[in-house]
């Protein structure tokens, strides 16, 4: 459940997100295991940057980690910069008192000096207070003040790789199961072959299918899949 600090931001978090529901491709096994160790408390005060060059699921992953961490009676917050960038950087003040801070898409703060300084100060505070700090974005797109770039590059950098094409069907089935929706293999293959082949798009399409199916009180057939893909 979201903590009061999360609610105060008026930024929603997907409360169904969990590492138990995150499809782990073979190339991401090491990354996910390191992140799970954080949840187990075996690496107190870790500072990690998740480098994601595409739509490989980093936003869901950060929300899943926040939820799982909070469910273990720890405090956490998820801050997506796509929404927070329009807020005052002062929202970062005091968050180092929490056990875990996840900030998504930090490369969006490029050329915004007040945000760059606020994030630099937060990194220092988290180091002193040994709170967990997870940042995500594209390390190659980061163009900020030198001190901030230097600090981030000293973090443990984990790469979130794209799912292989031969894993897409398995991933789609796993997501469908977690959403409690039923789609035939034939229709699932149609969905994959007619969508952008990344896990973010697949998840968004399946989530919309779940919503439409519930609202219309009908099963998910080919016509509904075509409609959702066309409107996405």
Stretches found by the model and what they are:
Residues 1-37, 214-232:
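A short, basic N-terminal segment
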Residues 139-140, 155-167:
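Conserved AAA+ ATPase "SRH/arginine-finger" region at the nucleotide-binding site
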Residues 182-194:
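Short conserved motifs of the RecA-like P-loop NTPase core
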Residues 195-209:
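The conserved phosphate-sensing helix
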């Amino acid at each position: 459940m979201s903590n009061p600090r999360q609610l105060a931001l008026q930024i929603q978090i997907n409360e169904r997100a969990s590492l138990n529901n995150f499809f782990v491709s073979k190339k991401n096994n090491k990354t996910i295991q390191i992140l799970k160790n954080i949840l187990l408390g075996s690496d107190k005060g870790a500072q990690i940057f998740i480098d994601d060059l595409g739509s490989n699921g980093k936003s869901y992953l950060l929300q899943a980690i926040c939820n799982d961490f909070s469910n273990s009676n720890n405090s956490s917050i998820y801050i997506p910069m796509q929404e927070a960038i329009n807020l005052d950087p002062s929202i970062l003040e005091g968050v180092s008192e929490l056990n875990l801070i996840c900030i998504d898409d930090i490369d969006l703060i490029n050329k915004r000096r007040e945000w760059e300084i606020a994030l630099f100060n937060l990194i220092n505070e988290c180091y002193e207070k040994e709170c967990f700090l997870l940042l995500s974005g594209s390390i190659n797109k980061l163009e900020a003040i030198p001190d901030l770039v230097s600090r981030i590059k000293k973090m443990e950098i984990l790469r979130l790789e794209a799912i292989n094409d031969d894993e897409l069907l398995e991933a789609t089935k796993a997501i469908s199961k977690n959403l409690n929706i039923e789609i035939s293999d034939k229709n699932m293959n149609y969905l994959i072959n007619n969508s952008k082949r990344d896990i973010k798009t697949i998840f968004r399409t399946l989530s919309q299918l779940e919503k439409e199916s519930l609202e219309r009180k009908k099963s998910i057939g080919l016509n509904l899949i075509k409609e959702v893909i066309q409107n996405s």
